[in-house]
Amino acid sequence: MLFNKYDVNAVEIHDPGMVKYINVKSALNLHTGGRFSSYYAGKINMNVVERLINKLMRSEKWTGKKYSAYKITEEAFQIIAEKTKQNPLQILINAIENAGPREEVTRLKYGGIAVPKSVDVSPSRRVDEALRNIATGATNASFKSKKSIVNCLADEIMAAARNDPTSFAISKKEEIERVAQSAR
């Protein structure tokens, strides 16, 4: 159970490449305290909701305030459950699958000239990019706005799950893929 309300066993991950990298195992406490940081690719052992909470703590206002980010996420999940009548964890998984870019650009040097080259994105980076863009979109939408961060996070997750281009995460993904397509 997540937040003692939502069933984690009912969640399905549709993207076969991301199954290994999205951890939805039940956790009593979404605070590992960096337990997996010393392991290679240890972040795949962390619950995806805790990773979202950690991404919310990136901006200046929320830096280091894990309990505040925890409450924001919990209240956003309540709003998602009320509006969609579905498991909010499933909505988050759908949002991550939709918001993760499939290809991006890297720079190669050929004889002193930097040339952009399109490359595939690893599944773990897709999850990281999706979570980062969802959290960034929510904090940007709530900055100097009457809407609270809770409502902005819920709206961002639901819009990304619908693959709505008004979502910051989806628009960022499309921008990255468009640039990569031009660099083929």
Curated annotation (Swiss-Prot):
**Organismal lineage:** Archaea, Methanobacteriati, Thermoplasmatota, Thermoplasmata, Thermoplasmatales
Family in the record: Belongs to the universal ribosomal protein uS7 family.
Q: What is the recorded function of this protein according to its Swiss-Prot or TrEMBL entry? A: One of the primary rRNA binding proteins, it binds directly to 16S rRNA where it nucleates assembly of the head domain of the 30S subunit. Is located at the subunit interface close to the decoding center.
Q: Which Pfam families match?
A: Ribosomal_S7
Q: How does it assemble?
A: Part of the 30S ribosomal subunit.
Q: Does the keyword Lipid metabolism apply?
A: no
According to the lineage, what is the superkingdom?
Archaea
Tell me which GO cellular component terms the UniProt record holds. small ribosomal subunit
Per the record, the GO terms for biological process are:
translation
What is the name listed in the Swiss-Prot or TrEMBL entry for this protein? Small ribosomal subunit protein uS7
Q: Which InterPro entries match?
A: Ribosomal_uS7 (IPR000235), Ribosomal_uS7_arc (IPR026018), Ribosomal_uS7_dom (IPR023798), Ribosomal_uS7_dom_sf (IPR036823), Ribosomal_uS7_euk/arc (IPR005716)
Picking any one GO molecular function of the record gives: structural constituent of ribosome
List the keywords (alphabetical): Ribonucleoprotein, Ribosomal protein, RNA-binding, rRNA-binding
Looking up Gene3D superfamilies in the UniProt record yields:
Ribosomal protein S7 domain
Supply the PANTHER family for this chain: RIBOSOMAL PROTEIN S7
Species of origin: Thermoplasma acidophilum (strain ATCC 25905 / DSM 1728 / JCM 9062 / NBRC 15155 / AMRC-C165)
Keyword RNA-binding carried by entry: yes
